[in-house]
Amino acid sequence: MSSSTVPAAGAAAAMLLVGTSTAVSATIADYPVLSGQALRYALAAAILLAVVRHRRLPRAGLTYRDVLLLLALAATGLAGFNIFLVEATRHASPAVIGTVVGAIPIVLALVGPLTERRRPAARIVGAAVVVTLGAAVAAGFGGGSLRGVLLSLGALAGEVAFSLLALPLLPKLGPLRVAAYPAALAVPMLLAAGIALDGTSSLRLPTPTEAVAFGYLGVLVTATAFFLWYDALRRLGAARAGLFAGLVPAGALVTTVALGLGEAGVADVAGALIVGAGVLIGLRQPAQTGLDGQADRRVPRSPAEDEQPVPTAPERQ
């Protein structure tokens, strides 16, 4: 089995899980959005921190730089992303938002290597363009105002920050802690934003159906997917891991069809096939070279953690 097979499978699983949130979120459409995200992250943080404690990982002393990075990650990649996304839906169609945010593979393919003082690999950039094209075909292009596009770009920036701000933290803290700490920090940020935008009416108990949906989102789409993503990010690097972000529409499509909420159209299937082709192009390893034809510069493992998966509670993003 290739050394990249396991992290690649983890990245694919993470993005497919994130994609399922689209259909599941339809069941909580009447719940205040930002407060709901705070509830989801609180559940995920509780699970991840419990796993950290159960595994008795060595203490990792946080420097001021670590704390600032964690706060920035929570503020931009989690809270900021959700705020921009919610506001964007008021000024642009879901297709526009999906197409803009779907450019994440290209951005990571270009910016990821630059953060490591390397030139972007032409093959990975080309693969990212193919993946983004596939995501755009699946999402459609829709319509929206300039403000909606700008807000969508803000959500895209949050997605980029979610990965790039984690890179310097992963060698020291490992994927479990990097998934857990920002999730916990984002909870008060989202609660405050929810109260500011919707008032105290945003604070209410979920119905039983909503509670089940939040349980799924918190346990699988957040706790599990975040861990899998950060583990893959550490082992594949931002450019190659970013290719798998194109699988989000595929996850949404499968869940929508499975739940009987819609049917798979020609554009959906074509987009998924294009995304798959782009991922395969990006994962193909040139003979006798590193992953991108250069020295392999993946993020080293944390001495505090191995790659054990997150234990999941029975029926526990």
Model-derived segments and their meaning:
Residues A11, T63-L73, R119-V131, V149-S152, ...:
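Cytoplasmic-side transmembrane-helix entry/capping segments in multi-pass membrane proteins
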Residues S3-P7, D30-A38, L62-V67, G140-A161, ...:
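Juxtamembrane helix-entry segments on the extracytoplasmic side of multipass membrane proteins
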Residues S35-A46, T76-L78, N82-R119, S152-A155, ...:
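Specific alpha-helical transmembrane segments that line the substrate/conduction pathway
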Residues L48, A103, P120-G140, A157, ...:
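Hydrophobic transmembrane alpha-helices of multi-pass small-molecule transport proteins
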